[in-house]
């Protein structure tokens, strides 16, 4: 998937925002996922699935840092995400349908926190997250 110069610039700005508080954004995204799609909890053994949960914050931080790193490699997502795709597809056996659900939660979280979340920004972020989902799903089983 090719990204325009404008999309890359927008994605870079959003990545900078996410990089400032990866645990906070990530925990909110995961907590939102667990509420809206309770079946996604089956991959995690947490006592507290809220954004305040320590394990939710740790894993949420990992997720957001991975998105930030992917944003830095938009021209070669396939190579950049290969190891992560293998881990989720072969070792953890995460159903690929979970990735778009989490992507929606990331977009909603961004939209609730950013004062400027224009349709163009939404489209650029959605395009990045869709490409990430596609790559992560490529090694399923």
Swiss-Prot record:
Function: Involved in oxygen transport from gills to the various peripheral tissues.
Recorded superkingdom: Eukaryota
PROSITE patterns: GLOBIN
Molecular-function annotations in GO: haptoglobin binding; heme binding; metal ion binding; organic acid binding; oxygen binding; oxygen carrier activity; peroxidase activity
Binding site for O2: 59
Gene Ontology process terms (BP): hydrogen peroxide catabolic process
Distribution of this protein across tissues and organs: Red blood cells.
Protein name, per record: Hemoglobin subunit alpha
Domain Globin as annotated: residue spans: 2-141
Protein encoded by which gene: HBA
Assembly and interaction partners: Heterotetramer of two alpha chains and two beta chains.
Residues annotated as binding heme b: 88
Keyword vocabulary terms for this entry: Heme, Iron, Metal-binding, Oxygen transport, Transport
Gene3D superfamilies hit by this protein: Globins
InterPro entries reported for this sequence: Globin, Globin-like_sf, Globin/Proto, Hemoglobin_a-typ, Hemoglobin_oxygen_transport
Gene Ontology annotations for the cellular component aspect, listed alphabetically: blood microparticle; haptoglobin-hemoglobin complex; hemoglobin complex
Family affiliation: Belongs to the globin family.
């Amino acid at each position: 998937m090719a990204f325009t110069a404008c999309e890359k610039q927008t994605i870079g700005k959003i990545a900078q925002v996410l990089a400032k508080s990866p645990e906070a954004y990530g925990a909110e995204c995961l907590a939102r996922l667990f509420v809206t799609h309770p079946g996604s909890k089956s991959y995690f053994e947490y006592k507290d699935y809220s954004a305040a949960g320590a394990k939710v914050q740790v894993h949420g931080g990992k997720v957001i840092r991975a998105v930030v790193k992917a944003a830095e490699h938009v021209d070669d997502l396939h190579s950049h995400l290969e190891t992560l795709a293998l881990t989720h597809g072969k070792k953890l056996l995460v159903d690929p349908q979970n990735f778009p659900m989490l992507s929606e939660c990331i977009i909603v979280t961004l939209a609730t926190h950013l004062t400027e979340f224009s349709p163009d920004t939404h489209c650029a972020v959605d395009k990045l997250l869709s490409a990430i989902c596609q790559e992560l799903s490529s090694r399923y089983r």
